[in-house]
């Protein structure tokens, strides 16, 4: 099966900056994307506009969200786009507060209904990144929590799959190896992994607090990680992959840096501001994404959805040119990746020159 290009809906502009889902889907269609990861933020934004209702602190406005999901499906179908997944089902795994665990588990029923309305069978779960005092280090508890969602999803009609992803700043699961170990221990056919070049390399290769931008022994860490990935990962459990790069900062992300936020890990601040598309060296891209991508596409033989999950400060800027620019940059990076690695793909490739734009 050839690989298919997708992008996260918020990667084409944040709704709080005035970027409607309509405008972002239009841009995705124009530049040859075949699917989107629907960011929950965008679904809520559509629901608010359709119903003139806002979510209360006590809980979601359920009927408005279901109506929004139906509307979004129609929007996507009109543009020939599929919904790859609904994401992120956040801060669920390993909560110390078990009452909060139950409240979040109750929300899963709505997410499953939304997924059904969107005609997707995947809900993505990022590994918990709440403060350490809120997240257990008991791996058995984390596995048990994730078994629960997998079993609930398996009983849904149609069944729902879950893609678990380690983030490079997650509290307990910040390495793909640990994420993969958990997936194996959950041991459910509908529970798999999402492998993301940024989050893999952002943990073992990059260190935004270092003047070099790199961890000690970064190259050797990548070599070992790739060898482990190729030898250990069962590609049938990789539900989709994400391929992006990131910017090397001109100075360490420490107090006084424009992106420094004392309330979040440095890697999270870096991620939210500085991800780039593959090959964007003109913007400072420096991660060895090509090597990891080669392991994904040729080492384990991944085929299927490839999403460009960008987070970048450009997404929060206003102006109708933002979705257009980001969609074009992503499509050009995809064409470069396909050419560099000779990846069989479905759909056309963009060949126009890069757009000149500020970050």
UniProtKB/Swiss-Prot annotation:
Pfam family, one: AP_endonuc_2
The keyword Lyase belongs to this UniProt entry's keyword annotation: yes
Domain of life of the organism encoding this protein: Eukaryota
SUPFAM superfamilies: Xylose isomerase-like
Gene3D superfamilies, per database record: Divalent-metal-dependent TIM barrel enzymes (3.20.20.150)
Record comment: activity regulation: Divalent cations such as Mg(2+), but also MO(2+), Mn(2+), Ba(2+), and Co(2+) activate the enzyme, whereas monovalent cations as K(+), Na(+), and NH4(+) decrease its activity slightly.
Catalytic activity annotation: 3-dehydroshikimate = 3,4-dihydroxybenzoate + H2O
Family from the record: Belongs to the bacterial two-domain DSD family.
Listed name of the protein: 3-dehydroshikimate dehydratase
Source organism of this protein record: Neurospora crassa (strain ATCC 24698 / 74-OR23-1A / CBS 708.71 / DSM 1257 / FGSC 987)
């Amino acid at each position: 099966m050839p690989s298919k290009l997708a992008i996260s809906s918020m990667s084409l502009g944040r709704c709080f900056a005035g970027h409607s889902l309509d405008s972002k889907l239009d841009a995705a269609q124009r530049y040859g994307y075949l699917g989107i990861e629907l960011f929950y933020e965008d679904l809520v934004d559509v629901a608010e506009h359709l119903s003139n209702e806002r979510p209360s602190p006590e809980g979601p406005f359920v009927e408005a969200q279901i109506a929004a999901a139906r509307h979004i499906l129609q929007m996507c179908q009109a543009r020939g786009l599929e919904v790859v997944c609904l994401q992120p089902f956040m801060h669920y795994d390993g909560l110390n507060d078990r009452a909060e665990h139950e409240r979040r588990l109750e929300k899963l029923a709505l997410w499953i209904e939304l997924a059904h309305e969107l005609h997707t069978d995947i809900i993505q779960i990022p590994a918990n990144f709440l403060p350490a005092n809120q997240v257990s280090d008991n791996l058995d508890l984390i596995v048990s929590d994730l078994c629960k969602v997998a079993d609930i999803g398996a009983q849904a009609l149609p069944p729902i799959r879950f893609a678990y992803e380690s983030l490079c700043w997650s509290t307990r699961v910040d390495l793909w190896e640990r994420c993969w170990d958990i997936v194996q221990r959950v041991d459910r056919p509908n529970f798999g992994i999402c492998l993301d070049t940024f989050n893999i390399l952002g943990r073992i290769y990059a260190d935004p607090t270092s003047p070099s931008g790199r961890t000690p022994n970064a190259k050797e860490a990548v070599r070992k990680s790739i060898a482990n990935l190729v030898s250990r990962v069962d590609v049938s459990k990789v539900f989709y992959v994400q391929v992006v790069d990131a910017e090397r900062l001109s100075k360490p992300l420490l107090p006084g840096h424009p992106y420094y936020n004392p309330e979040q890990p440095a890697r999270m601040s870096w991620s939210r501001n500085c991800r780039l598309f593959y090959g964007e060296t003109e913007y400072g891209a420096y991660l060895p994404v090509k090597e990891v991508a080669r392991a994904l596409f040729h080492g384990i033989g991944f085929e299927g959805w490839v999403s460009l999950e960008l987070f970048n400060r450009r997404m929060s800027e206003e102006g109708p040119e933002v979705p257009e620019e980001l969609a074009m940059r992503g499509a050009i990076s995809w064409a470069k990746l396909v050419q560099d690695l000779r990846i069989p793909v479905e759909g056309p490739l963009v060949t126009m020159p890069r757009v000149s734009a500020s970050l």
